[in-house]
């Protein structure tokens, strides 16, 4: 165990922004970093591409007054190990997610997922529905994207030489991706962005992100199977928080969640991109807080409030 912000471990890390104690679990590929803060009903936050547990810092700070907040970094991301030779597919990350849960030893918990964190974490939930209390989905998915035009174009870039060069040769490509995930640039302080790209300072550190980016289409068979088996989660309380100006996950993807979970609590943010927790921090925290506490009678008010933003 070490303190997050130790400059000998991650000299780029600003511990004033990420002031949490770091913990580690041994999983396939090396040491997986996670934070475990607060007491109460457990909530596990699962990031996707190309982010890490830093994205949840505000929610951890605010929700940990009533919840045990756990946020992990996939192998190859954040403060976790980044081995040169490892699979880095979403299926491999999903297996490691199970290893982390075995390490922590929770009986039941709620999930908050973003981007690829959806299928990575919900694959476990589908197989273990009795351990899941609630699910909050933030601009994420749980199905094959092989027929999705936007993701086909993205996948073509990621498999092409220029896409690989842009993502792995320097940190500039990932920096552009992160900036593109934010629509309302004025709402995110400049000091935040280097914390997202810091884990990828070396070329060798960016390999895992590149492989995962190829999984949107490359893991279509696995993703298709997850969607087919989603019925085990049909009765779970589900909240969907959606930045409507996401460059990849559109209103069509949001509507797929709505159709599959007609009773879901859906809160949209018309002017926000994928990193809605950065752009609408207070509003996201308020909506998630009420949902995790089961205050469904307040959720319609929350939706009306958010319609103003």
Regions found by a protein language model. Name each.
Residues 27-29, 35-37, 71-114, 286:
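Active-site loop/oxyanion-hole signature of alpha/beta-hydrolase fold enzymes
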Residues 55-57, 80-86, 146-148, 251-252:
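Conserved catalytic-core motifs of eukaryotic protein kinase domains, centered on the activation segment
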Residues 107-149:
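Conserved hydrolase catalytic core segment
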Residues 146-211:
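Helix-rich cap/lid subdomain of alpha/beta-hydrolase
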Residues 272-285:
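Catalytic histidine-centered segment of alpha/beta-hydrolase-like enzymes
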């Amino acid at each position: 165990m070490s303190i997050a912000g130790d400059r000998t471990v991650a000299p780029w890390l600003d511990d004033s922004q990420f002031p949490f104690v770091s913990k580690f679990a041994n999983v396939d590929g090396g040491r997986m970093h996670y934070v475990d803060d607060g007491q109460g009903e457990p909530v596990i936050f699962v990031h996707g591409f190309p982010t890490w547990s830093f994205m949840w810092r505000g929610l951890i700070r605010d929700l940990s007054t009533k919840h045990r907040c756990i946020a992990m970094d996939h192998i190859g991301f954040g403060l976790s190990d980044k081995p040169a030779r490892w699979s880095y597919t979403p299926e491999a990350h999903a297996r490691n997610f199970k290893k982390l849960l075995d390490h922590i030893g929770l009986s039941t918990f709620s999930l908050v997922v973003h981007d690829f964190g959806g299928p990575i974490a919900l694959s476990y939930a589908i197989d273990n529905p009795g351990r899941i209390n609630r699910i909050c989905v933030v601009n994420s998915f749980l199905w094959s994207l092989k027929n999705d035009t936007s993701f086909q174009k993205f996948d073509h870039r990621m498999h092409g030489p220029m896409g690989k060069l842009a993502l792995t040769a320097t940190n500039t490509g990932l920096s552009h991706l992160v900036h593109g995930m934010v629509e309302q640039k004025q709402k995110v302080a400049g000091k935040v962005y280097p914390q997202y790209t810091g884990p990828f300072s070396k070329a060798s550190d960016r390999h895992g992100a590149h492989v995962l980016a190829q999984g949107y289409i490359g893991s279509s068979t696995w993703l298709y199977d997850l969607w087919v088996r989603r019925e085990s989660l049909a009765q779970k309380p589900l909240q969907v928080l959606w930045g409507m100006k996401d460059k990849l996950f559109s209103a069509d993807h949001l509507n797929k969640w709505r159709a599959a979970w007609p009773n879901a609590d859906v809160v949209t943010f018309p002017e926000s991109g994928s990193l809605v927790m950065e752009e609408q921090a207070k509003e996201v925290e308020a909506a998630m807080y009420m949902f995790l506490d089961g205050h469904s009678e307040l959720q319609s008010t929350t939706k009306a409030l958010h319609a103003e933003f």
